[in-house]
Amino acid sequence: MQLQRGEIQGYDFNRMVLEFTMLNQGKVILCAISTAAMDDLEGRRDVRPDQRVDQFMRLREVIEERASRKFFEEQARADRPVVLRSNDFFRTPR
């Protein structure tokens, strides 16, 4: 099962996250990804705040896939946001 694509909410400068939504059987799931995670995924550190939505668009497929996987792996609830950080993409093997 996969979450469905929702909408981009925008960049929150104070929290340094890009907020977006996903849908689980029509129910809106709030999601966010840290700017550090996007920078790590893209291998860049020079992205300005006004470029964050464009950066998200370039990385959207991998971000949404990981948000969906995290939602179901952690049996997340619709009333809690799914927040992605660098360690959600780059885990060290055990």
Regions found by a protein language model. Give the residues of each.
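Short, charged/polar N-terminal "headpieces" of proteins
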Residues: 1-27
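Intrinsically disordered, low-complexity regulatory segments
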Residues: 1-3, 28-29, 35, 86-94
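Short, exposed beta-strand "edge-strand" segments with a Pro/Gly-rich flavor and a Y/T-containing core
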Residues: 5-7, 25-33, 76-84
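A broad, structure-centric signal for solvent-exposed, well-ordered loop/edge residues
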Residues: 8-10, 15, 29, 40, ...
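A short, structured beta-strand/loop element
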Residues: 19-42
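Acidic, low-complexity intrinsically disordered segments
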Residues: 44-94
